[in-house]
Each structure stands twice: as structure tokens, then as C-alpha cells.
Swiss-Prot record:
Participates actively in the response to hyperosmotic and heat shock by preventing the aggregation of stress-denatured proteins, in association with DnaK and GrpE. It is the nucleotide exchange factor for DnaK and may function as a thermosensor. Unfolded proteins bind initially to DnaJ; upon interaction with the DnaJ-bound protein, DnaK hydrolyzes its bound ATP, resulting in the formation of a stable complex. GrpE releases ADP from DnaK; ATP binding to DnaK triggers the release of the substrate protein, thus completing the reaction cycle. InterPro entries: GrpE, GrpE_coiled_coil, GrpE_head. GO terms for biological process: protein folding. Homodimer. This is Protein GrpE. The gene is grpE. Its main location: cytoplasm. SUPFAM superfamilies: Coiled-coil domain of nucleotide exchange factor GrpE, Head domain of nucleotide exchange factor GrpE. Residues 1-15 have a biased composition (Polar residues).
């Protein structure tokens, strides 16, 4: 054999030595491709893309902030409504309880007007009852309960309950002329309407007075002549 001829072992070594060189160069291919792609992107296009992303994020932020503000406002309104409803319920319970006490006050007042105790023992008992009545009235005052002043006031169905209507020379028409049962209110809310008598006005004049006035007219004319 000549000196230039290669043995099979030498050929195998040459092939095996070439393979690693191919493997070492292969990882550089993706990196080169990425660099080429980056170099191919226009900076103006990239800036426009970033601005679009920023605009989308701002819009999402505004939407979420608006939703948050709306939820916060709804919760605040709910809290206020709950507080108002609880306050109204508490007032209704208090007014209902106070309304139940008013007939007891009426009984004390009727007893005070009608009874005329005689003797020291009866008078002492009467004073004891009146002491309880005064305490009860004081408690009602502390709770804001007040009596209605109705006589001489114009009839108001929101405050008064008309039981009778009669002619009156003292009060004009539709004016309360007499209080039959006390009315009470608390903080602008009616606990009990006042039962009243309402005036119908002075009524028609006496028919007998008209001829007398007519007869007096000629005499007055004659005197003037």
C-alpha cells in the first residue's frame, strides 16, 4: 500500500471528529435567528405596540376603578339605608309603646275632673293617684311627647278627627271650636289624632230681623228729609 492510503480506523476517527464540530455549531443557529428577527423589527413599530399596550392597561385601570367606585357608593348607600331603616323601626316601636300609654293618661285625667274625694283618707288616696299621673306625664315629656293645641286652629285631617260639626258665632267655618279628646304628637309624628268639634260658622241670620230692618229704613229716610 502507498503512504497516502488511509486505513479504516483512520477514516472512522475522521468521521467521529467531524460530528462534535457539527453539534457545537448547532446551538448558535437559533441565537443568530433571534438576533436577525430583532434587527428586523422597526423601532417605530415597537414603540407603537408598547403605546397600544399602555393604552389598553390604562383603559382597564379606568374600568376597574369605575367599578370600584360604583361598588363603594352602592355599599355606602346600603349602609345609610340600613341605618335609616333601623332608626325608623326604633321610632315606630317607641311610638307604638307610647300610644298604648295614652289611654291610661286619659283615665287619670277623667278621674281628676270627675272625682271629688271627701275626707282625709280619700283625699290622700286621690293625691297618690295624681302623683302617679304627674310622673307618667313627666315620662312622656322626656320621651318628646307633646299635646296638640287645637282649639281655634283650622281643621286639619292630618291632625284632627272631626266628631261633630255645629254652628258657632265665636269661630269661623272649618275652625276647631272644642277639643273632645286630646291629641298627641312626637317629633312631628302623630301618636293620636285629636277628636274635635268643628265650627260651621255663624249660620244664617234670623229671618225675623229682616222685616224689622226694612221697616226702619223708611223712617230713617223721612227723618233725613
Amino acid at each position: 500500500m502507498s503512504g497516502d492510503a488511509s486505513t479504516p480506523e483512520q477514516d472512522q476517527n475522521v468521521v467521529s471528529g467531524a460530528v462534535p464540530a457539527t453539534r457545537e455549531s448547532s446551538p448558535d443557529a437559533p441565537e443568530a435567528t433571534s438576533e436577525q428577527a430583532s434587527a428586523a423589527v422597526d423601532p417605530a413599530d415597537r414603540m407603537q405596540q408598547l403605546e397600544q399596550e399602555l393604552s389598553a392597561l390604562k383603559q382597564e385601570h379606568d374600568t376597574l376603578n369605575s367599578q370600584y367606585m360604583r361598588i363603594a357608593a352602592d355599599f355606602d348607600n346600603f349602609r345609610k339605608r340600613q341605618s335609616r331603616d333601623q332608626d325608623d323601626m326604633r321610632k315606630q316601636l317607641v311610638c307604638s309603646t307610647l300610644t298604648e300609654i295614652l289611654p291610661v293618661v286619659d283615665n287619670f285625667e277623667r278621674a281628676r275632673q270627675q272625682l271629688n274625694p271627701e275626707g282625709e283618707e280619700a283625699q290622700a288616696l286621690h293625691r297618690s293617684y295624681q302623683g302617679l299621673y304627674k310622673q307618667l306625664v313627666e315620662v312622656l315629656k322626656q320621651q318628646g311627647v307633646a299635646r296638640m293645641d287645637v282649639v281655634g286652629q283650622e281643621f286639619d285631617p292630618n291632625l284632627h278627627e272631626a266628631v261633630l260639626r255645629e254652628e258657632s258665632s265665636e269661630f269661623a267655618e272649618d275652625v276647631v271650636s272644642e277639643e273632645l279628646q286630646r291629641g298627641y304628637h312626637r317629633d312631628g309624628r302623630v301618636l293620636r289624632h285629636a277628636m274635635v268639634k268643628v265650627s260651621m260658622g255663624p249660620g244664617p241670620s234670623d229671618p225675623g230681623s229682616a222685616p224689622a230692618e226694612a221697616a226702619a229704613a223708611p223712617d230713617q229716610t223721612a227723618e233725613e228729609a
